[in-house]
UniProtKB/Swiss-Prot annotation:
Function of the molecule: Cytosolic metallopeptidase that catalyzes the removal of unsubstituted N-terminal hydrophobic amino acids from various peptides. The presence of Zn(2+) ions is essential for the peptidase activity, and the association with other cofactors can modulate the substrate spectificity of the enzyme. For instance, in the presence of Mn(2+), it displays a specific Cys-Gly hydrolyzing activity of Cys-Gly-S-conjugates. Involved in the metabolism of glutathione and in the degradation of glutathione S-conjugates, which may play a role in the control of the cell redox status.
Cofactor note: Binds two metal ions per subunit. Two metal binding sites with different affinities are located in the enzyme active site and can be occupied in vitro by different metals: site 1 is occupied by Zn(2+), Mn(2+), Mg(2+) or Co(2+), while the tight binding site 2 can be occupied by only Zn(2+) or Co(2+). One Zn(2+) ion is tightly bound to site 2 and essential for enzyme activity in vivo, while site 1 can be occupied by different metals to give different enzymatic activities. Mn(2+) is required for Cys-Gly hydrolysis activity.
GO terms assigned for molecular function: aminopeptidase activity; carboxypeptidase activity; metal ion binding
Gene encoding the protein: LAP3
Broad class of where this protein is predominantly found: cytoplasm
Keywords attached to this entry: Aminopeptidase, Cytoplasm, Hydrolase, Magnesium, Manganese, Metal-binding, Phosphoprotein, Protease, Zinc
Similarity comment: family membership: Belongs to the peptidase M17 family.
Name under which the protein is recorded: Cytosol aminopeptidase
Catalytic activity as recorded in UniProt: Release of an N-terminal amino acid, Xaa-|-Yaa-, in which Xaa is preferably Leu, but may be other amino acids including Pro although not Arg or Lys, and Yaa may be Pro. Amino acid amides and methyl esters are also readily hydrolyzed, but rates on arylamides are exceedingly low; an S-substituted L-cysteinylglycine + H2O = an S-substituted L-cysteine + glycine; L-cysteinylglycine + H2O = L-cysteine + glycine; S-benzyl-L-cysteinylglycine + H2O = S-benzyl-L-cysteine + glycine
Cofactors: Zn(2+); Mn(2+)
Phosphoserine carried by residues: 6
The organism of origin for this protein: Mesocricetus auratus (Golden hamster)
């Protein structure tokens, strides 16, 4: 659902930020 997609997007953003 929307919440799941939103959570995935947030997690991806966090991962990319940490791996930057």
């Amino acid at each position: 659902g929307v919440l799941f997609a939103s959570g995935q997007n947030l997690a991806r953003t966090l991962i990319e930020f940490l791996l930057r």
